[in-house]
Amino acid sequence: EWYMGGHSLGGAMAAEYVSKHVDEFDGLYLFAAYSTADLSDSDLRVFSVYGSEDGVLDMDKYRKYRSNLPEDTYEYVIDGGCHSYFGSYGLQKGDGTPDVAFEEQIEMTVDFITYNSK
């Protein structure tokens, strides 16, 4: 099985790429991201993950573009998680205050990917 994934703008670009190569992938992981490409009629397994304290992800756009994903897209909200903790670059300007440690959010994310990619 092949999955594509990305964080923030990288997630949007991953979704765009997958939309043009949909037959080559089994699924897509979006981390604090949304897809402007229409994948709604695809058979992809799509997982959307973001933190409850994310201050960077534009939730209005996230909701607006939700219809571009398959109906059975699974959404996982990391309680206390933030935008910056999907990467290793420090806290991003405008992000919320996380209620979990960086290592904890990374571990939850890895566990989620591992469990759902079986």
What are these regions (language model features)?
Residues 1-3:
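Gly/Ser-rich "nucleophile elbow"/oxyanion-hole loop immediately N-terminal to the catalytic nucleophile
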Residues 5-14:
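Gly/Ala-rich beta-loop-alpha elbow adjacent to hydrolase catalytic centers
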Residues 23-35, 45:
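A conserved short beta-strand
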Residues 40-46, 69-73:
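Short, proline-enriched alpha-helix->beta-strand connector loops that line the catalytic pocket
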Residues 48-50:
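Short beta-strand/loop motif that positions the catalytic acidic residue
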Residues 53-57, 83-84:
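Acidic catalytic loop of the alpha/beta-hydrolase fold
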Residues 57-68:
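Short alpha-helix in the alpha/beta-hydrolase fold that links the catalytic acid
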Residues 73-118:
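C-terminal catalytic histidine-bearing segment of alpha/beta-hydrolase fold enzymes
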